């Protein structure tokens, strides 16, 4: 069970939190029309200034900027965990597991596209350094079976080993995604139960439940907005967590026909009312 005498780490975490991008920052970023403008704002006005200090913002492209920002936030997390050896507590490996799942899914996408030889260019060494398997070997993968061979000694192997290709030789990335994310959600819950106790455990389980519940609300909206997906289609991409939205309202939400209808129904939920309280512009959206 975790020792709660991590006051120095708590103070450091609060410092990181204080440096986060605020609402005004996001409003300013939304006004930008090019990647160089976004990079320049981040360089001049946010805590990313140091990691962007040697970057020519006038010529930076989106992929490179994303990699720099992702690496910086990941390294901040690693430094925080190393500070008082939180990395020795299993729960704090959650971010590494999430990264591994993301990389595995991306590898399958490249296999489906027939461009697996290019996948090596997308693997970030800073992620590979903290992986539970030899992530750089994924650059040698050419087939799904090659991927399984590398994952054989990991929990991921048994989760995805029985997947079959369709008539075009492609693997169902959506189905694999939800299988791996289901594993991830359950892993986080079990780690919380194992490493925390009492009110802290209760609060952590509640917080993570809300986080995944909101992810479902957001992802369902995206599917509704961009593809007009129905409930049956959306149900396959949802995290397996109870919702704070009533069953009746949740069913109504998932069976809306448009993104506008979705927002109208969402306004009548606890999440929607909270969103309106935080941002009155939402009440006018539909």
Residue ranges and their predicted role:
Residues 1-286:
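N-terminal domain-start signal
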């Amino acid at each position: 069970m975790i020792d709660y005498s991590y006051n120095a780490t708590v103070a450091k975490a609060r410092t990181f939190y204080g440096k986060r991008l605020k609402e005004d920052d996001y409003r300013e970023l939304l006004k930008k029309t090019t990647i160089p403008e976004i990079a320049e704002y981040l360089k001049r006005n946010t805590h990313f200034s140091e990691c962007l200090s040697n970057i020519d913002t006038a010529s930076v492209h989106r992929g490179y900027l994303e990699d720099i920002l992702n690496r910086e936030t990941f390294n901040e997390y690693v430094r925080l965990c190393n500070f008082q050896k939180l990395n020795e507590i299993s729960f704090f490996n959650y971010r590494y597991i999430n990264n591994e799942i993301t990389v595995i899914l991306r590898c399958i996408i490249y296999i489906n596209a027939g461009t697996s030889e290019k996948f090596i260019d997308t693997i970030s060494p800073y992620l590979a350094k903290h992986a539970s398997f030899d992530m750089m070997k994924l650059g040698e993968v050419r087939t799904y079976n090659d991927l399984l061979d590398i994952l054989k000694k990991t929990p991921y192997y048994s989760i995805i080993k029985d997947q079959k290709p369709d008539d075009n030789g492609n693997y169902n990335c959506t189905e694999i995604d939800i299988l791996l994310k289901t594993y991830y959600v359950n892993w986080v819950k079990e780690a919380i139960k194992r490493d925390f106790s009492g009110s802290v455990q209760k609060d952590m389980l509640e917080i993570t439940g809300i986080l995944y519940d909101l992810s479902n609300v957001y992802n369902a909206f995206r599917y509704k907005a961009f593809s007009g997906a129905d409930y049956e289609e959306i149900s396959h991409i949802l995290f397996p967590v109870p919702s704070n939205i009533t069953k009746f309202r949740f069913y109504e939400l998932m069976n809306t026909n448009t993104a506008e209808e979705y927002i109208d129904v969402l306004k009548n939920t606890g999440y929607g009312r909270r969103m309106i309280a935080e941002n009155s512009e939402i009440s006018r959206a539909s």
